[in-house]
């Protein structure tokens, strides 16, 4: 994501986007992307998640504790 792109403009998030949004480490983000129930997909070796799937996942897991 370049400096002029905002979250509102993105429709697909990368590992780095999720790291920044959730304020988690790269290691934690990779564990999350590889966990069951996290609706991500791969393009080649790169992990991605759609904005709508990410928002739905966040809302449906509100209040839950994750050990990643």
Residue ranges and their predicted role:
Residues 21-48, 55:
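Major-groove DNA-recognition helix of helix-turn-helix-type DNA-binding domains
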Residues 1-5, 65-68:
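Short intrinsically disordered terminal tails
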Residues 54-68:
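A short, Lys/Arg-enriched interface patch at domain edges and termini
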């Amino acid at each position: 994501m370049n400096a002029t792109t905002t979250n509102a403009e993105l429709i697909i998030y990368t590992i780095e986007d999720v790291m920044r949004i959730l304020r988690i480490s790269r290691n934690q983000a990779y564990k999350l992307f590889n966990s069951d129930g996290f609706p991500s997909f791969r393009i080649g070796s790169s992990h991605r998640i759609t904005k709508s799937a990410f928002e739905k996942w966040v809302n449906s897991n509100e209040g839950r504790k994750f050990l990643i």
